[in-house]
């Protein structure tokens, strides 16, 4: 069985199943999970929905490379990345990033690294529907600053 699970899907994900898979090995001492959700407010406007597009082969390749970099840098055991695409409503879960390791420090750092690179380097395109209309979301300076520390 592989120690990496990567999925890009329209349907909601099961956090509990992903967590169980991450932490089922007896050598795991720490499991760190991040779950991102659709916010109801962005850039000062009320958000009603978010539409995510991607190119499947490109996206899966980018996610696989990001996870491989994390595994090369930290002593981690399992990684699970699930990213949703399609139409999402306010409050819906968008992304799950989970990392297990023998020690918490490795798991925390690897999880944050994966999330930072996923947010800036994975080819997802986001269109928000707000009270002001629709708009494509661009990368923020803070996202690039997060990458610079790695």
Swiss-Prot record:
Top-rank taxon, per record: Bacteria
SUPFAM superfamilies found in the cross-reference section: Molybdopterin synthase subunit MoaE
GO molecular function terms noted in the UniProt entry: molybdopterin synthase activity
Enzyme class: transferase
InterPro entries named in the record: MoaE_sf, Mopterin_biosynth_MoaE
Catalytic reactions on record: 2 [molybdopterin-synthase sulfur-carrier protein]-C-terminal-Gly-aminoethanethioate + cyclic pyranopterin phosphate + H2O = molybdopterin + 2 [molybdopterin-synthase sulfur-carrier protein]-C-terminal Gly-Gly + 2 H(+)
One Pfam family named in its UniProt record: MoaE
EC number: 2.8.1.12
Record keyword DNA-binding present: no
Protein's recorded name: Molybdopterin synthase catalytic subunit
Gene that specifies this protein: moaE
